[in-house]
């Protein structure tokens, strides 16, 4: 009898809790004009809450997740915080517009808010770990007192032009920050000392102070036309840097001795000081660099330095090099004899009169377009699949031994004769002038 009473009381308590959570969800439905939702299956019904569209419950029937993507209009009711077990809230407002004050949600760990979010305040969520938001109006965005926050993603609305300041308060556990298309004149993250990964894309930043980010390992800052100077000298743990598509004239990475990946493509750099013997990939294409010293980078596998002002390039110490693009510089010679692992070479648009490929037996792709090269010996390059000699001065070429070749381009070149194998048939990607003659090599 005693145990029966206990069981009965427990069931009544659970029933009462479910009724309470049911009433909270009903108020949520009415506050956001749920009658206009496209998907509202079982909402306001007597069915278990986990059968309501977008609602997930635990084994006791308590709401742990709300995930809705629909037309919503109104303000999320404050009583939603009384869903004591709610851990995940994801709202994608596809039309309409909603306002939220996420304050004192006791168990909330993940918050995802996208679409027409007109106002967003997030405060005093002691368990919140991840926040991803695309508020329509960042003037009405505020976040504070979320001590467990480790991931923050913010994305601005399309075609936004009004610049704003984003000042992040202290988040001691914040390790990853993503900001996309948010038009900023200033970004203050000096109080986020544990940041390890930063991704800032198309934000029109004019300056970025990362002096307090000593734990930073990954940095991507791209698409900021007004960013001219970037000092990363205190970010000594950086492993990967992508600062492509800015207007950087000064880049300080002198203390980044753990760096393995650097992409500074499409900036306005005239010099680049590198100091990491671990560097595997370097992309400094489309800058104004006149001197590039890579002699100490024995781990370098990928080098992209095309579109600069280089008059010389010494890669003799880079014996692990696999990919090289150095086109459209001022190079008059290029020595690749020590780079036997190269499978990709693009060296067109230079002043090269010749190039020795006798040691490049792994070569699969070769391009010397718009080049004064007159002779090209490919006898050692039996793995070649692609050849581009567009606009070159080569008159004769032997491809009779290249059984893997599927792409050949020689438009606007001086080419007159191609030596081919006995059973040769032109491939689909065969681009030559009409007066070029193919001769069979016996």
Locate the predicted segments by residue.
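LRR flanking "cap" motifs
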Residues: 30-78
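Conserved hydrophobic beta-strand positions in leucine-rich repeat
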Residues: 64-68, 89-91, 111-113, 120, ...
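Leucine-rich repeat
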Residues: 59-63, 82-87, 104-109, 124-129, ...
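Leucine-rich solenoid repeat scaffolds
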Residues: 390, 395-442
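Short, non-transmembrane alpha-helical segments in secretory-pathway proteins
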Residues: 21-33
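Bacterial Sec-dependent N-terminal signal peptides
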Residues: 1-20
